[in-house]
């Protein structure tokens, strides 16, 4: 079963998933195994997003240097990449309501 994050009809609260067929499933109704899989998907999303964004910022910083633009701009782009790479992405995802709800369900 493939799950994607979707806002609940009453507003995003981080506790509702929508499956591939469009059915909305509250996190509380997922089996612990499905919640574990969903949590893994969320963690992979954070790592992938951080890697892609980090690469974008690093490439922009390199282009800035190559084009002779101010060094402060390149430094800001490098700093932006550092803020979202590696542990920062994992810390962010573990701070979300959805990750905590899935973890509670896994441990239930």
Please report, for each region that a protein language model flagged, where it lies by residue.
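Alpha-helical propensity feature that highlights long, continuous alpha-helices across diverse contexts
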Residues: 1-108
């Amino acid at each position: 079963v493939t799950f994607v994050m979707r806002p609940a009809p009453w507003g995003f609260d981080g506790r509702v998933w929508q499956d591939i067929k469009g059915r909305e499933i509250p996190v509380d109704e997922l089996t612990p195994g499905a919640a574990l899989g969903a949590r893994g998907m969320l963690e992979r999303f954070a790592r992938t997003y951080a890697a892609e964004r980090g690469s974008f910022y690093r490439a922009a910083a390199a282009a800035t240097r190559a084009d002779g633009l101010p060094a402060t701009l390149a430094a800001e782009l490098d700093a932006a990449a550092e803020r979202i790479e590696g542990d920062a992405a994992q810390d962010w995802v573990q701070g979300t309501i959805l990750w905590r709800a899935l973890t509670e369900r896994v441990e239930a």
